Amino acid sequence: MYYLMNKNTVVAAFEKQPATAFSDEVLFREVERTGKLPFGFEDINAWLNSRKSSKHNAHLRKLMREMGCDDNEGFIRVTHAATINDTFWIKSDRESLTWEQISLYRNPFTETISRLAFEGVGLYAGDFSSTSPELSCEGSFRKCFRKEKQRGSFGSDIFIYKRGNDLGPGLEPYCEMLASEIAAIISPDNYVPYRTVLLHDKLASKCNLFTNEQHGYASFSKLMKAKSLQDVFDFFDRIGASQAFREMLVVDSLCFNQDRHAGNYGVLFDNDTLEITGMAPIFDLNLSMLPYVSMKDFDSIGDKLFEYAPVLGDDFTRIGQMAMNDTLHDRVKTICDFSFAFRGDDVFPPERVKAMESIIRRQAQALLSSETLRTKDVFFSQNAADDEQYQGEVRAAVKRFHIFADAVDQMELGSNVFKSDCVSSDTVQYIFEMNGYELTVDFLKRKILIADDRLQAVTPDALQDAAPAVYELYDKLFGLFTNMNQY
């Protein structure tokens, strides 16, 4: 028997299921519920899988496999499913462990695991008798957790170090630091400060942990299945956090954050009662500030921004405008002449800092505008202009199609012209292609059959001599097309 615990309180009991002929995976089934279950809990197997960091990180998946904790039974044995997000954990009925012995907040981390998770190098000889948060955290970037003597901005002695992408220029730590400067202005009471540091000779962003034994974190993905952005806003409005949610949207709009999925924002709650106490601070900003845009691309930044879109909403500028209110208006106003404290280095050069400042200032002015704007209106994009022209041509062609369809329905042509509703005609194809209105060919093919379908492409005079009835149709269509030019 196994017990799902919240600190030292049993909230559920479950047991291993008998093996099946078609699965080697050890599964569990619930036996009893005796307390409040974690947010988003559906069944014990899904909950265990959601605790594993390996679902996001291929390197940690390999590490966990070598440690024997990649399956649910091994994961319980090694980690007890403890995380730094809440105070839930698991023990077997053969163990006399207490929360005080398991808590990641109270006990030291395994340096070997921490370093392996952060550096991604081969296994070192080490003691895996204790564990570390790396095995049960979310996110695809290499990160590690360290306990330090001096506590941070949230009063915790636990700090998170997160690296950049090994396959790219590695600008993400800089971007996270810069975006947190914007967050400090827009959401001064509800953001996570980041700074850049070197750890084991690797650049990383560093922040303080905002959870503790009293207050846990639940991502929005565990709270509800929203069908629209309005559903998300309504949720935060119900818990009294609509202003905090607006602030997050504006920060993401100004910083062009592409990664605000439902796992990257959520709520804080009381670990004992599971009562929601407010919105979690704004965090996870490493995909803000255009980390994958080259310096050359800044010359045509509108084309790059045309390729991007936020996760919440469909346009960076528009969603920022929609989130604005009087309080945010005053804060965004200060961004119009904003400069970063960080002025650049060899990796993130000063000219890139200046380029980002220019973009953010222009975006701030757009958010303050009374005119409804989208990103393409603020940052000119030739690609967007070409796309808009194309869409305009399509709309005009569709309009011509409907005008033509109505006109054909009203034509009074000889009975020898129409014989079927579903047979095609080379002559009709010729009439259309001759005038460049291919969009309506299929319509007419379905509509009529020319009496002499053997006719090939001919001149109008030859058509009149060979098939007067067909020419009558051609003449009326040609006149219709000529009149369509005004549309």
Each model region followed by its residue ranges:
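Conserved protein-kinase catalytic-loop segment immediately C-terminal to the catalytic Asp
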Residues: H261, G266-L268
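Low-complexity, intrinsically disordered short peptide segments enriched in small/polar/basic residues
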Residues: V332, Q391, R395, A405, ...
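Amphipathic, interaction-prone secondary-structure segments
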Residues: D406-K447
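Intrinsic disorder/low-complexity segments
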Residues: A385, A397-V398, D406-V408, D452, ...
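Function-determining sites in protein domains
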Residues: V408-D409, G414, F418-D421, T459-V470, ...
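Intrinsically disordered, low-complexity regulatory segments enriched in Ser/Thr/Pro
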Residues: D24-V31, L37-P38, N435-E472, G479, ...
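Phosphate/dinucleotide-binding and metal-coordinating scaffold of catalytic cores
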Residues: M1-V250, L254-F256, L268-E393, R400-H402, ...
